[in-house]
C-alpha cells in the first residue's frame, strides 16, 4: 500500500515520528512530506497519514488549512491523523478543538504519538509557557508532561492505517 505521510514539525519530534511511522509501514512504500515545503499531491497514494505538533492546544496552521482544503480527497482514500506534544492530559481537548467531527468519523485512526521537550528550541511566550507548565505539571493531572515518543502508539497507528477496511 503506497502511503503519503504529511507532517509539520516545530522542534523535530513530529518529523521523527513520521519517519518511525514510515519504518513501521515499510519505508519503501512511503513518502514523507513536510507541509512547510509546499502543497502535497495525493494522487498515486492508497492512503495518507497527516501529523502535526500541538502547541498551546493548537495544531499547525498549514496542517489545519490542508485538512480543510483537501477534505474531499482525504475522505476518498484511507487516512489517519496523528498528533505530537508534551501535554498528554490535554490531547483529548486538542483533538476536539482542532479536528472536526467528520474528520474523526472518516479517519481510519487518530493517535497521540507523545512528545519530547526541547526547552532550548523555544523562544519568547512559548518558553514562558513551557516553564509555567513544568511548574504546575506535578500538581494538576491535566497538565501531565510527556517527554517521550510512544513507539507502541506508532505501531498501533501503522497497523490500523494499513488494515483493510470492511468495505475494501
Question: Which role does the model predict for each range below?
Answer:
Residues 24, 28, 56-168:
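FMN-binding flavodoxin-like domain, especially the glycine-rich phosphate-binding loop
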Residues 43-44:
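Alpha-helix C-terminal capping/helix-to-coil transition sites in glycosyltransferase folds
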Residues 2-27:
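N-terminal beta1-alpha1 ligand-phosphate binding loop
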Residues 28-40:
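A short, well-structured beta->alpha microelement
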Residues 6, 33, 82:
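The conserved SAM/SAH-binding core of class I Rossmann-like methyltransferase domains
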Amino acid at each position: 500500500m503506497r502511503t503519503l505521510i504529511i507532517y509539520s514539525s516545530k522542534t523535530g519530534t513530529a518529523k521523527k515520528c513520521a519517519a518511525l511511522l514510515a519504518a513501521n509501514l515499510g519505508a519503501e512504500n512511503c513518502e514523507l512530506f513536510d507541509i512547510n515545503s509546499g502543497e502535497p499531491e495525493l494522487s498515486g497514494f492508497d492512503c495518507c497519514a497527516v501529523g502535526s505538533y500541538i502547541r498551546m492546544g493548537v495544531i499547525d496552521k498549514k496542517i489545519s488549512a490542508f485538512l480543510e482544503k483537501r477534505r474531499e480527497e482525504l475522505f476518498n482514500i484511507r487516512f489517519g491523523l496523528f498528533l505530537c506534544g508534551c501535554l498528554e492530559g490535554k490531547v483529548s481537548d486538542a483533538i476536539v478543538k482542532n479536528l472536526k467531527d467528520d474528520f474523526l468519523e472518516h479517519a481510519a485512526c487518530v493517535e497521540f504519538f507523545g512528545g519530547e521537550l526541547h526547552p532550548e528550541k523555544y523562544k519568547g511566550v512559548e518558553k514562558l509557557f513551557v516553564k509555567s507548565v513544568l511548574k504546575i505539571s506535578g500538581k494538576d493531572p491535566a497538565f501531565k508532561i510527556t517527554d517521550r515518543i510512544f513507539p507502541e502508539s506508532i505501531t498501533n497507528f501503522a497497523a490500523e492505517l494499513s488494515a483493510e477496511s470492511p468495505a475494501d
